[in-house]
Amino acid sequence: MASQGTKRSYEQMETGGERQDATEIRASVGRMIGGIGRFYIQMCTELKLSDYEGRLIQNSITIERMVLSAFDERRNKYLEEHPSAGKDPKKTGGPIYRRVDGKWMRELILYDKEEIRRVWRQANNGEDATAGLTHIMIWHSNLNDATYQRTRALVRTGMDPRMCSLMQGSTLPRRSGAAGAAVKGVGTIAMELIRMIKRGINDRNFWRGENGRRTRIAYERMCNILKGKFQTAAQRAMMDQVRESRNPGNAEIEDLIFLARSALILRGSVAHKSCLPACVYGLAVASGHDFEREGYSLVGIDPFKLLQNSQVFSLIRPNENPAHKSQLVWMACHSAAFEDLRVSSFIRGKKVVPRGKLSTRGVQIASNENVEAMDSSTLELRSRYWAIRTRSGGNTNQQKASAGQISVQPTFSVQRNLPFERATVMAAFSGNNEGRTSDMRTEVIRMMESAKPEDLSFQGRGVFELSDEKATNPIVPSFDMSNEGSYFFGDNAEEYDN
């Protein structure tokens, strides 16, 4: 983006730092990762988990959720003020799975939040280390993105379920800060804004008084975040209109839906980071890796190297395919839920199949499922190549896409043309073209119509051998363009339910 100079890098957002040079950034990200690892090791000790149990991704997720809950100030305050029967606001917990006599058993644990905060701070040099907490949130968000569809949520806000490639980060909590905002897709932020506007329409006091003033500031800030993701002047000008509206209502909702649709072709900039489960960082720290000294980057080769030699297990339900479970977690680790499957397959060195063809449900296991009938297997999280993660959407061109997802959001910085089906997308733009933003709308539509399939629309570096740590010899893969590229194609993924 042109305004690069004024932006902090994603890693700086991630670590809450001010301007730093590359080495300092690598060190502070490393410090954050090391803190997560040390915390995980300590929790495994407190819970008396065996080495094998500590590598179980379901146990990792429970421990991660406990620390997020322990630090969720607003919810903790709410729980204390609105006590509900049988819930201790000072405690948090979840299922821990243990191997007993050759079978898996579930044990529900409860912990003092204060105790968990103590362990977390101790692992992070006495600090609250919010960056590490956000990092864990992004990992959970990436896992949700790969596991669930957001069809219902899209339909509820008046958007088209085929716009799912714009919904990255839709389950991230509001408190995830700048690092969280960077990884949110255009559709996610449009949806948050639409929800706000709808509340304002239904509740006369929403924008009024001291609370209303705070709401207004949040609204304008969110508008600016969304504006910053768009790469064309017309889209940004429309965002200015939405932000400056005295009394946001249906006209603004229309504009936001229009803008979200336009992002299927004129793609926004959305950051991608490889965030791994806490147990992976724990394993590395336990084996003597000093993240802060070595430095670490979420967008380079480091996560690939870490996954090359980490053994993580997962519980597998009786009718699930372990290879498919591995694909799901691999996609989550690299934030590749909306990436072109051909690119993902090339990097992974194994065919990555669409969600509808996966015989696996989510990673987490419901409390009413019978764990004794389950086995565990190793997740195959290694890759054949590595590639730099991207923060831009690339400009687009056309190509036949599918009935499920009609566009992709690139994760890896690899040259390719980006599939989308112009006819399908443009059909969404017939109709409403009047109102204050008509000239901008016309301009946006004109740009979309002139997007050409011949252009190499995403200029990327290419992929690299895992031995090529400095990214010196890019390999530009050639893709069979007749092939299906989107993951949620013809989909039957489960809906995300809070």
UniProtKB/Swiss-Prot annotation:
Motif annotated as Unconventional nuclear localization signal, chain positions: 1-18
InterPro entries: Flu_NP (IPR002141)
GO MF annotations, alphabetized: RNA binding; structural molecule activity
Compositional bias ranges of the Basic and acidic residues kind: 8-22
Presence of keyword Glycoprotein: no
Keywords associated with the record: Capsid protein, Helical capsid protein, Host nucleus, Host-virus interaction, Ribonucleoprotein, RNA-binding, Viral nucleoprotein, Viral penetration into host nucleus, Virion, Virus entry into host cell
Record bears the keyword RNA-binding: yes
SUPFAM superfamilies: flu NP-like (SSF161003)
Processing and modification events after translation: Late in virus-infected cells, may be cleaved from a 56-kDa protein to a 53-kDa protein by a cellular caspase. This cleavage might be a marker for the onset of apoptosis in infected cells or have a specific function in virus host interaction.
Primary residence: virion
Parts of the chain that traverse the membrane: none
Motif mapping: Bipartite nuclear localization signal: 198-216
Region named Disordered: 1-22
GO cellular component: helical viral capsid; host cell; host cell nucleus; ribonucleoprotein complex; viral nucleocapsid
Similarity annotation: Belongs to the influenza viruses nucleoprotein family.
Role description: Encapsidates the negative strand viral RNA, protecting it from nucleases. The encapsidated genomic RNA is termed the ribonucleoprotein (RNP) and serves as template for transcription and replication. The RNP needs to be localized in the host nucleus to start an infectious cycle, but is too large to diffuse through the nuclear pore complex. NP comprises at least 2 nuclear localization signals that are responsible for the active RNP import into the nucleus through cellular importin alpha/beta pathway.
Subunit (UniProt): Homomultimerizes to form the nucleocapsid. May bind host exportin-1/XPO1. Binds to viral genomic RNA. Protein-RNA contacts are mediated by a combination of electrostatic interactions between positively charged residues and the phosphate backbone and planar interactions between aromatic side chains and bases.
Listed name of the protein: Nucleoprotein
UniProt source species: Influenza A virus (strain A/Wisconsin/3523/1988 H1N1)
Lineage, top ranks: Viruses, Riboviria, Orthornavirae, Negarnaviricota, Polyploviricotina
